[in-house]
Amino acid sequence: MITQKMKYALKALLELADEARRDSPQALTIEEIATRSGTPKRFLEHILLDLRKAGVVASIRGRSGGYSLLKAPRDVSISELVRRIDGPIAPLPCLSRSAYQPCDDCHDEAACRIRKVFAEVFWSYLVLIDSLTLEDMLAAGNPAAKLLED
């Protein structure tokens, strides 16, 4: 499950991506992003800072400053964003790619039935989420539908 913070990050990125598609895109202020996305302004400052550190958005200072999308939507991986904003996405620490830890109460990972069941579910989830980009989210309809058709 993604956190509310992640949902706010995605809403902000979708607004920035929509703005980038315009004929004359402008940097958006935090206030504009908050209004357009329905996201509380107080959360956006921290979220946009995280996204800037991740190299996804740029911040422009000054009178006509604000935020703009730095990467093309097709280059913004949803799974990387989730990991950046929410942390590891694995259901068990022993399945995590980025934060692997053996389970404290497990003596034999290879024989662990809990791990085996959750590994199958998790790998299916990874196939889907690792293939999704911000561009998929911008597309009309269900972004997962095109993956299921292939």
Swiss-Prot record:
Pfam families: Rrf2 (PF02082). Residues 1-139 form the HTH rrf2-type domain. Coiled coil: none annotated. GO terms for cellular component: cytosol. GO terms for molecular function: DNA binding; DNA-binding transcription factor activity. It comes from the Bacteria. Gene3D superfamilies: Winged helix-like DNA-binding domain superfamily/Winged helix DNA-binding domain. Keywords: DNA-binding. SUPFAM superfamilies: Winged helix' DNA-binding domain. Signal peptide: none annotated. InterPro entries: TR_Rrf2-type_CS, Tscrpt_reg_Rrf2, WH-like_DNA-bd_sf, WH_DNA-bd_sf. The keyword DNA-binding applies. This is Putative HTH-type transcriptional regulator rrf2-like.
